[in-house]
Design a protein with these regions (language model features):
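Short, well-ordered secondary-structure microsegments
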Residues: 1-48
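Hydrophobic core/packing positions within alpha-helical solenoid repeats
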Residues: 5-8, 25, 43, 89, ...
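Specific register positions within alpha-helical solenoid repeats of the TPR/Sel1-like families, i.e.
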Residues: 6-13, 48, 94, 136-138, ...
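Short coil/turn residues that cap or connect secondary-structure elements
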Residues: 13-16, 160, 200, 238
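Internal alpha-solenoid helical repeat scaffolds
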Residues: 31-208
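Long, internal scaffold/assembly segments composed of regular secondary structure
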Residues: 182-264
Length: 264
């Protein structure tokens, strides 16, 4: 099981109930767990996703012990594991861009390879259809937050093989939109679409779609797909998270435009 967890970066775990995973984990001898430090990293991230922070921190201590005691780890791989541990710990600082970036920079300095515990084609937005809604945390600080995103994301991309690429661009586009700068928002939106083309960042593409929907209410723009076409495209990917995000944005659009009978 630990070999599978390590290889598929938590995809299998996401289909299981947290209680089931914890039950198996509690039955696994500590000595066996220590032989699979990459699996421990994946489990740490899953515990964060499941809001089980105490277990996440417990696994972190187990990982550090594994790195110290593992007889066959090279110094390079020890650095990679410690860096990836920093990366996963950064989630605990969500949504403080500066504090998250401190961990990303630390990880970037230690790592010589992309992270294994995070798949580059996995979700980046924790189910949110908006990067701005995720990371704008204080009134009056938006420009500062945008600059922080521009500075920190390259470090994150380096250690995750481009996971979430385009996040800073779509956040900038959303900022223009919220300030009523619709032309600038449209330009930045098209830049974001171009940036993510073909790179598998579906969660960022959905953020782009949500902004395109909102922009279409305020100015005459042509969306890339009809709602029906886009939903059909997402269904072909067999990922219910993407479909649910899209349905939520459609519900928002239809509510704002008074088409309540079309709300999914």
């Amino acid at each position: 099981i630990l070999r599978v967890v390590q290889k598929d970066a938590g995809i299998l775990l996401a289909s299981l109930k947290p209680e089931e995973v914890l039950e198996v984990l509690n039955r696994c001898p500590v000595s066996v767990l220590k032989e699979y430090p990459l699996a421990i990293l994946v489990l740490m991230r899953c515990m964060f996703n499941w809001k089980n922070i105490p277990k996440m921190l417990e696994l972190k201590e187990l990982l550090l012990a594994s790195i110290r005691e593992h007889p066959k780890l090279s110094e390079e791989e020890r650095g990679n594991l410690l860096g990836e541990c920093d990366l996963i710990q950064s989630f605990l600082m969500y949504n403080d861009i500066s504090r998250m970036s401190q961990f990303h920079r630390s990880a970037s300095e230690k790592m010589t390879r992309p992270a294994i515990s995070i798949r580059s084609d996995g979700g980046w937005t924790f189910g949110s259809p908006s990067v701005l809604m995720m990371f704008h945390r204080k009134s009056g600080d938006l420009d500062k937050e945008l600059e922080e995103m521009n500075q920190c994301m390259p470090h994150y991309y380096k250690i995750t093989n481009g996971h979430g690429q385009g996040a800073e661009t779509i956040m900038s586009a959303e900022a223009h939109f919220m300030r009523g700068n619709f032309v600038d928002a449209h330009i930045a939106l098209e830049k974001a679409y171009t940036q993510i083309q073909g790179n598998g960042q579906e969660s960022i593409a959905l953020c782009c779609d949500f902004l395109a929907q909102r922009l279409s209410i305020c100015m005459d723009i042509k969306m890339r797909n009809t709602f029906e076409e886009r939903r059909k495209e997402l269904l072909q990917g067999h990922n219910t998270t993407w479909v649910n995000i899209f349905d939520s944005t459609c519900a928002y659009y239809y509510a704002v435009t008074g088409q309540t009978e079309r709300i999914p």
